[in-house]
Amino acid sequence: VFSPDATQDKKGTRDIYVAVSLKDRENLFVSHDYGDTWQPVEGQPTQYRPTSLSISNNKELVLTYGDTPGPSTMKDGGVWKYDIAKNKWTDISPIRIKKDEKAGFGYISSSIDPNNPKHMIVSTHHLDGKHGYTSDEMFRTTDGGKHWKPIFKTGFRYDHSKAPYTQVAPLHWMFDIEINPGNPEHAIFTTGFGGWETFNLSGVERKEPVVWSIMSSGIEETVPLELYAPEKGARIISGVGDYGGFTHFRPDELTDGSHSNPHFANTNGVTGAWLKQE
């Protein structure tokens, strides 16, 4: 990331920060000469590896950490803020863990409202029932990380209308989350089954359901592996990656769900008996 008030000229921005996916050694570096030379940032946590790096307009870095790069299981992690001017690190993790304990999960992404540096969101990876959560979570703060509110645990609603088949997919892999720079109520997160957006992010403050809508309209987040067109019945039977496959009676209409009984994560081949189509 580039320091928001750093010197800029024909060479570019002078002050640059880079996080590297390293563990048990220095993993955050700064350059004050346009990237010609680099030095490790003092006092940084090294017990995990960085998973995201954000910078606010008041010169504070926010880093999420995990003990693996993902998407494999994470057993430890945290969220830290670095005040560049004061050279001060602060643990602002939404779920605080005792010093001698591991979190049992990690943090994977962060976003800072460019118009309000105290407004941030972060997402977890592999959060489970150990801390009272049933799935991964997105946390929101409006005071710079002193207090956090869970968005999904507090109350939310999904709108699957653009892609009904996503109703069977659990919340997971929120590896990128973003607050719209032009609208702080508009936030986006990506998962293994598409992108989602909300236009009432602050609903969590009023205990109103935050509504998340699937963004896949004409673009499906999957890989077609096989197509079969029987003479009778369905027009097309598809085999796809991750979702198994679908039975399409009308190719121009969305299906409600994927194959079941049996269901395969990946369906690599589909065929039928041509002399006995039923």
Task: Report the location of each language-model feature.
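Extracellular glycan-interacting surfaces
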Residues: 1-278
